[in-house]
Amino acid sequence: MYTLKQDRPHPVPPPPPLTMDHLQHGYSTNTPVTLPGIPEAARSVSTVYEGRIYSLDVVQQPIRARMCGFGDKDRRPLTPPPCIRLIVRDATTQKEIDINEIDTSFYVLTVDLWNAEGTSEVNLVRHSATSPSISTATSSAYPPPANIMPFPQYAQTHGYPQTAYPPYYGGQPGYNPHAGYQYPQGGPDPYYPGLPAASTYYPPGTPTQALGPQSALGPHISSASTGMFTRNLIGSLSASAFRLTDPDDKIGVWFVLQDLSVRTEGSFRLKMNFVNVGTQSQAQDQSPGGTPSSPVINVGSAPVLASAFSEVFQVYSAKKFPGVIESTPLSKCFAFQGIKIPIRKDGVKGPRGGQSHGSKGQDGEGEDWENEG
């Protein structure tokens, strides 16, 4: 009989995996790198397109807002209003292009609501039809149906902030721009079949009956949840470009999101996507007279040229809301140029305590406002 030796050494365990600090600097540039303190999913993305580099700079970040619930009469906008500057640089010289050389006629910025980690959309919120209280609301990470978006769904990109090939805001590269949308049959309204109101809809691929346990949303939606989905972020979810001058007297291309509200409380981020929905070859199209032809709307797919996340902002309930943010110099500067931004008064009162100028209004907490422009 043979006996095992008790003093036999144990097998040497495998070495632990190397961290980013131990990797050599010669690794492939196609590997995404996560910066300390910045979630990889929440990083900005810029693209090189037709010899130009497009990027977004969220100059004025949203800080807080009061939740507006599921009614449509008590809208509470984010404060301060997000202001995003578009930066266009030459791909060869890396210098910013003069604004007079940029045609912003069809520049559009769209906005979505994301969770605080920047990992998933929370554009939809579900609430019970029988108990429409705020406590029954739950956010959903499922995106809205593709056939009700102003543009088709675009492909998400990850990796380095600057990529040579932009994602397409019309689907994958095989998308047929002439195929058109396929609307569901048998409904009175192709966008909202069988629904009484346009602000409420069922998730994609779901019949108009109550959601069952085998619905396309996954196993976590049970038959007991007969609620309906509605948008959590409401208001103007897209904005056109404006040529505005900042407080430093520098003109630029700006997008102002002054009409955004959130239905439920919590911590969120905004994701902004910049798209040029005009013809992409308008600079090369020449009329018989030798002058550039006027830009026209792009009937096909359009690439997402840049995207950016806002910082985390907080949405409070009515009891916990600390109040609106004081009007910033940037908001006042843009309001003076005609942008409809509600400006908080600085204690200037007229006769009998009334306002000396501007339209009178209150935000519900006794705060006086005046609407410029």
UniProtKB/Swiss-Prot annotation:
What does the entry say induces or represses the expression of this protein?
Expression is increased at higher temperature (37 degrees Celsius).
The UniProt transmembrane annotation reads none
Region of interest called Disordered, as start-end residue ranges on this chain: 1-26, 344-373
| Biological processes annotated in GO | sporulation resulting in formation of a cellular spore
Residue ranges constituting the Velvet domain according to the UniProt record: 48-344
Which keywords does UniProt give here? Answer: Cytoplasm, Nucleus, Sporulation, Transcription, Transcription regulation
Phenotype reported upon loss of the gene: Leads to predominant production of large tuberculate spores with severe viability defects.
Entry's InterPro entries? Velvet (IPR021740), Velvet_dom (IPR037525), Velvet_dom_sf (IPR038491)
List the biased-composition ranges (Basic and acidic residues). Answer: 1-10
**One Pfam family cited in the UniProt record for this chain:** Velvet
Q: Where in the cell is it found?
A: Nucleus; Cytoplasm
Any one Gene Ontology cellular component term annotated for this protein? cytoplasm
Bias (Acidic residues) ranges: 364-373
Q: What is its main location?
A: nucleus
The record's family statement is:
Belongs to the velvet family. VelB subfamily.
Q: What does this protein do?
A: Component of the velvet transcription factor complex that controls sexual/asexual developmental ratio in response to light, promoting sexual development in the darkness while stimulating asexual sporulation under illumination. The velvet complex acts as a global regulator for secondary metabolite gene expression. Component of the RYP2-RYP3 heterodimeric complex that plays a dual role in activating genes associated with spore maturation and repressing certain development-associated genes.
Q: How does it assemble?
A: Component of the heterotrimeric velvet complex composed of LAE1, VEL1 and VEL2; VEL1A acting as a bridging protein between LAE1 and VEL2. Forms a heterodimeric complex with VOS1; the formation of the VEL2-VOS1 complex is light-dependent.
Kindly provide the name given to this protein in its UniProt entry. Answer: Velvet complex subunit RYP3
